[in-house]
Amino acid sequence: MSIFDKIRFIIKIFKENNMIIVNGYNNYPFILTFILNIFSCNKKFVATESDTQLQIPTNPIKRFVKWIYLSIIFRNKYVLGFSGGSDSHKDLFRHYGMQGERIFLMPMMVDNSKFYQKNKVLPEVFYFLYVGRLVKHKNVEELIKVFKSRFSNLNAELRIVGSGEEEEYLRNKYQSEKVKFLGKKFTADLVEEFQKASCFVCPSIYEPWGLVVNEALSAGVPVIATKEVGASYDLINGKETGCVAANMAEFGDYMVELFNNPKKLLVFSKNGSDLMQNKWNYDFYTNCLNKSIKKVKKWQ
């Protein structure tokens, strides 16, 4: 599809609908839709769906440009914020001037059912599982260092699924019988890794959401995540499905705690599975979407 065909398609969608949902707010589909709405006599509600947490740039120029751009967009009464989470994700919209009544939770989702298992059985070897890209901000090297310092003489293994720019460096430096790099895995092979894991670890320095947390909990696998992981507020904090660490030293403490406490591990496992089967699922997403549509209809 050429750029002109894409533009024609966006204009067609704009004309045919009273409410338009766009993923993100800094791409040409959203910007074009926003501009069309400014000049249209027949105003539409334009929802931007975002998994981005509030993060204010330290660079003053970037901070100013971001404030100008997002303030113009988010203060517009026809723009809605569809927030992937209910804490810092909503703060993003609030910070740049969007009124609370125009902000809706639109929960970040995966197909949970692919990962369900009836009875979680803990393996003889305690498997810590990481799934994700091997890039700097995922903090995998620090995870490996913490694991090696705490579990060198214990019956535990760190299994790393994924690839990325740091893969060769990390493999060459850390691969061993206890730290295994498994490369990319998909579909049934990936599900199998989740289902046999004892505990999932997400040590990111920055993570807008982290759908791997959804996948792990759906498989009944407790999660240890850093506080920077966007999913931690809705899926871990106060849910007894895992632990949220303020730093990597605390992260390591939680790894040891769950290793030494199989009863707690199984409680977290059941709670995580229950949360994903009975609450944070496609039905919940549908209810949130219908609620937003119902409210918008009253404004039209």
Model-predicted regions and their roles:
Residues 222-226, 236:
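Short hydrophobic beta-strand element within catalytic cores of glycosyltransferases
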Residues 184-185, 192-197:
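Short alpha-helical donor nucleotide-sugar binding micro-motif in glycosyltransferases
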Residues 237-249, 256-263:
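Conserved acidic donor-binding segment of nucleotide-sugar-dependent glycosyltransferases
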